[in-house]
Amino acid sequence: MTNTKTLEANISFEEALKELEEIVKKIDKGQESLETAVNSFERGILLKNHCEKKLKEARLKIEKITKLADSTVVLEEMEV
């Protein structure tokens, strides 16, 4: 785990999600010190935001791809 104040821009969605899941497990166990738990929580928020951003980017790409030949756009609600 790196500094809780920053998040590497090149971290993949899968890596971020895996790390976020690990943080949740650690916090749920309640075996970390308060300071460590707060730092983990802070990192978790950064990871959550990163995952949401990646999902939004993917959704926008998919919407762009669904353009029809006549340049109309078909936007279908996607479940994420």
From Swiss-Prot:
Name of the protein this chain belongs to: Exodeoxyribonuclease 7 small subunit
Gene Ontology CC terms, in alphabetical order: cytosol; exodeoxyribonuclease VII complex
Superkingdom of the organism of origin: Bacteria
Reaction equations catalysed: Exonucleolytic cleavage in either 5'- to 3'- or 3'- to 5'-direction to yield nucleoside 5'-phosphates
Position of the signal peptide: none
Enzyme class: hydrolase
Function: Bidirectionally degrades single-stranded DNA into large acid-insoluble oligonucleotides, which are then degraded further into small acid-soluble oligonucleotides.
Single annotated GO MF: exodeoxyribonuclease VII activity
Pfam families hit by this protein: Exonuc_VII_S (PF02609)
Similarity section: Belongs to the XseB family.
Thylakoid in keyword set: no
Keyword field: Cytoplasm, Exonuclease, Hydrolase, Nuclease
